């Protein structure tokens, strides 16, 4: 099943089900307005979303429209949090060294993780607004 978040002018976008070949999509407000809402009720909604996905792939959704990935936001434009388990030990070592802090031996074999800000994710194909160099 393929899901996406369509930019509808609201902060969290609108949930759409996308066809296997990425050519068509269908809105599913009767099931969940946003991807976060679908995830919150996943046990109940996953089978219903899967049924819509199958109907879409079978050409049985009259309200399907051409899918345009550039019209999408990030899947979860805002999230409660995100945690990344790919902290680089060499980077951690350099930062700690710059602060004059010892590098615990456990950092070389215990998993490292960091948490990032998640209040606003950029769309996958959206512009990155940069400040002027002037």
Q: What are the language-model segments listed below?
A:
Residues 1-7, 11-12, 20-21, 29-30, ...:
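Active-site microenvironments in enzyme catalytic cores
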Residues 16:
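Short beta-strand-centered aromatic/proline hotspots
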């Amino acid at each position: 099943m393929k899901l996406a978040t369509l930019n509808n002018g609201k902060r969290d976008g609108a949930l759409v089900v996308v066809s296997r070949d990425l050519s068509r999509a269908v809105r599913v407000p009767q099931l969940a307005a946003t991807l976060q809402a679908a995830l919150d009720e996943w046990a109940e909604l996953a089978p219903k979303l899967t049924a819509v996905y199958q109907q879409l792939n079978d050409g049985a959704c009259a309200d399907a429209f051409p899918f345009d990935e550039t019209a999408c936001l990030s899947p979860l434009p805002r999230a409660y949090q995100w945690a990344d388990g790919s902290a680089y030990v060499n980077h951690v070592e350099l930062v700690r060294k710059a602060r004059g802090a010892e590098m615990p031996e456990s950092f070389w074999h215990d998993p490292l993780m960091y948490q990032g800000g998640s209040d606003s994710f950029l769309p996958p194909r959206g512009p990155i607004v940069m400040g002027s160099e002037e």
